[in-house]
A protein has these predicted regions:
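Helix-coil modules at protein/domain termini and other flexible surface or pore-lining loops
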Residues: 2-211
Length: 211
């Protein structure tokens, strides 16, 4: 597909293929991997072998048939959040899928393990947001989820220049972020599990990008 040069941009900047003129998802020449959609999922798996427990956790999350590539934590501008069911229909088995993933595993009986992805979205959809990965021992869904959500929101707030107390608890910071008007939404996707059987248990939480 031919690229269209925008005269308002530096010569090295072009419209990424597939994006309409004026779209903010512009990238330097040759760098066109900007996701347009994302779906969130989570899962848990248990097996005598750690690797198999991980595979079963991916299966529970519905992403075991993908070649997953872990990336860092930026939520792209204008990226649309879709359901796990819709996302699964858009990715073919064996395809390479980029994701932000949190993973925790243990073989200790009665151990509580958790993995969580936090998300913070700016009010301006043309600005990028943040995703955070958190994995822990001894934390419930609520505790792990709040921690991940706090991290994502704090990173976004820092980028946007919103002043806040790093030592405040999540509820206090959440109010500051909402009042600022810069952060429109925060949420988390979390999987926790208490190990009840011998062998390994793995929990995963992930945000999977689609192009």
């Amino acid at each position: 597909m031919k690229r269209t040069t925008d005269p308002t941009l530096p010569a090295a900047e072009t419209s990424a293929p597939g994006y309409p003129e004026g779209d903010r998802r512009r990238v330097p020449e040759g760098l066109t991997l900007v996701p347009t959609k994302i779906f969130f999922t989570k899962g848990v798996g248990s097996h005598r072998d750690e690797l198999r427990s991980f595979e079963l956790a991916l299966k529970d999350a519905g992403i075991e048939r993908l070649n997953l590539v872990h990336v860092s934590s930026i939520f792209p501008p204008l990226c649309k959040i879709i359901s796990r069911e819709e996302g699964s229909k858009l990715i073919a088995p064996g395809s390479i899928a980029f994701c932000v993933m949190a993973r925790q595993a243990s073989n200790e009986m009665r151990r509580l393990i958790a993995s969580s992805i936090g998300c913070a979205l700016p009010a301006d959809k043309n600005t990028y947001g943040y995703l955070s990965e958190h994995h822990a021992y001894g934390q419930t869904d609520e505790v792990a989820g709040d921690f991940a959500e706090d991290m994502a929101a704090s990173m976004l707030a820092s980028t946007l220049g919103v002043e806040f107390d790093e030592n405040a608890n999540w509820d206090e910071k959440e109010q500051v972020f909402k009042i600022s008007g810069e952060i429109v939404r925060t949420f988390n996707v979390t999987q926790s599990h208490v190990i009840a059987n011998k062998g390994w248990t793995t929990v995963v939480a992930a945000g999977v990008f689609i192009f």
